[in-house]
């Protein structure tokens, strides 16, 4: 390998690892966000889903390893330290294997995860109270108001709430209330609201002034719309990682051959 080519490879690998260092910080931050977030669907799930909490710690661990790996790769590439390049190669290979494993597990457990999410949401709906003081209830109110959905499958899921259905007048979950399209301001209401000019003597969900579409459909629609982007990002990261493996091997072999060329021959 020519000296010029080696120099280009070395500094390209340095730039690559600098980006990887930043990526590691982003992944670590994402894991911390999952644990700390209190106002989204993530918060609803993590309060009762051990799988999501484990996933958050995995993100934190992978992020930390990626940061260390990026640092080792930068030092190893600039100073041509073969040992550090070797460690970098091993770390990168392990991360690539882990990503493929997680992807396969997620694909084959998608139905199980969907069922777990549904059970979690329905548990919140059944036990929801007019005061809505728990973190799970507040988080679910935020989700319904932000996404403009109601219930998991539909607004009829709320008929399983005994307190709500015990009202004699038209009463509905406040966070499900249908807002005018021109009103872009997000207002998260809590508890149960009584419909204006309610004259009926029973609480019929047909009369609720709410969004009728369930949050499950909204989530599926979002995934379908952004599936191409998600797939492209994952494929791009995998290609970059494979390129990093290739460059580290090339530089490692060059350093190895250079070391042997300096040995005196008799």
Swiss-Prot record:
Membrane-side (Extracellular) residue stretches: 33-53, 111-227
Expression tissues: Highest expression in the spleen and the kidney. Low expression in skeletal muscle and in the heart.
Post-translational modification: Palmitoylated. Palmitoylation contributes to oligomerization and surface expression.
Subunit structure: Forms homooligomers. Interacts directly with IGSF8. Interacts with EGFR. Interacts with VEGFA and PDGFA. Interacts with ITGA4. Interacts with ITGA6; this interaction reduces ITGA6 cell surface expression. Interacts with ITGB1. Interacts with TLR4; this interaction inhibits TLR4-mediated signaling pathway. Interacts with TLR9. Interacts with PLAUR.
Membrane-spanning segments: 12-32, 54-72, 84-110, 228-249
Name of the protein in question: CD82 antigen
Localisation: Cell membrane; Cytoplasmic vesicle, Phagosome
Keyword terms, alphabetized: Cell membrane, Cytoplasmic vesicle, Glycoprotein, Lipoprotein, Membrane, Palmitate, Transmembrane, Transmembrane helix
Keyword Ligase annotated: no
Record-level GO cellular component terms: phagocytic vesicle; plasma membrane
Species of the source: Mus musculus
Membrane topology value: Multi-pass membrane protein
PANTHER family recorded: CD82 ANTIGEN, TETRASPANIN
Segments in the Cytoplasmic topological domain: 1-11, 73-83, 250-266
Observed phenotype of the null mutant: Cd82-deletion mice are phenotypically normal. However, they display reduced bleed times and blood volume collection and an increase in platelet number. They also have increased retinal macrophage recruitment and exacerbated pathology. Cd82-deficient phagocytes infiltrate tissues in greater numbers in multiple disease models, and neutrophils also display enhanced migration.
InterPro entries per the UniProt record, alphabetical: Tetraspanin/Peripherin, Tetraspanin_animals, Tetraspanin_CS, Tetraspanin_EC2_sf
Keyword flag Glycoprotein: yes
């Amino acid at each position: 390998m020519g000296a010029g080519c080696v120099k280009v490879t070395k500094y390209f690998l340095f730039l690559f690892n600098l980006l990887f260092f930043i990526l590691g910080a982003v992944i670590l931050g994402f894991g911390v966000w999952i644990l700390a977030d209190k106002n989204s669907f993530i918060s609803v799930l993590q309060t009762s889903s051990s799988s999501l909490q484990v996933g958050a710690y995995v993100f934190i661990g992978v992020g930390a390893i990626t940061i260390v790996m990026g640092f080792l790769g930068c030092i190893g590439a600039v100073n041509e330290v073969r040992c550090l390049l070797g460690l970098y190669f091993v770390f990168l290979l392990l991360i690539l294997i882990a990503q493929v494993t997680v992807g396969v597990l997620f694909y084959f457990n998608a139905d199980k995860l969907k069922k777990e999410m549904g059970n979690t949401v329905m548990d919140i709906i059944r036990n929801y109270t007019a005061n809505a003081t728990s973190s799970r209830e507040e988080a679910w109110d935020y989700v319904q108001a932000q996404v403009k959905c109601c219930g998991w499958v539909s607004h009829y899921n709320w008929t399983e709430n005994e307190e709500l259905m015990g009202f004699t007048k038209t009463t509905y979950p406040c966070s499900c209330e249908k807002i005018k399209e021109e009103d872009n301001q997000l207002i998260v209401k809590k508890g149960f609201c009584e419909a204006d000019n309610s004259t009926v003597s029973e609480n019929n969900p047909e009369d609720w002034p709410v969004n009728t579409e369930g949050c499950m459909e909204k989530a599926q629609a979002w995934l379908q719309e952004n599936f191409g982007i998600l797939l492209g990002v994952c494929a791009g990261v995998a290609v970059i990682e494979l390129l990093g493996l290739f460059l580290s091997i090339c530089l490692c072999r060059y350093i190895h051959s250079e070391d042997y060329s300096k040995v005196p021959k008799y």
